[in-house]
């Protein structure tokens, strides 16, 4: 049987990775939906590369964007299954894992995968 602390286990991920993922997904969203508003000339080496992708591979960018979100949905659902498997039974904790994994993907899921619940000693 899981301990009360184990049943409600939740750990926020690294602020560094959450920042990197948020900025990357934000930029990707900008490129896919509003490519005409991007100041390519002000982005250094990233600007011409992004402009090339927008001009020559926009369909691939769009498909990749939706695939990335689909993967995040899959990771989130797996996080719920993993919560149950690891004895995290609190609905609130499961919701937090689901949301964190949905928005930040593998950066969140690796924390949950690494979690090992404490075993109670049998007397």
UniProtKB/Swiss-Prot annotation:
It comes from the Eukaryota. One of its GO terms (cellular component) is membrane. The keyword Membrane applies. Keywords: Acetylation, Membrane, Transmembrane, Transmembrane helix. InterPro entries: TMEM254 (IPR028110). The modification N-acetylalanine is found at residue 2. It is a multi-pass membrane protein. It is found in: Membrane. The chain crosses the membrane at residues 15-35, 61-81, 95-115. PANTHER family: TRANSMEMBRANE PROTEIN 254. This is Transmembrane protein 254. It comes from Homo sapiens. The lineage of its organism: Eukaryota, Metazoa, Chordata, Craniata, Vertebrata.
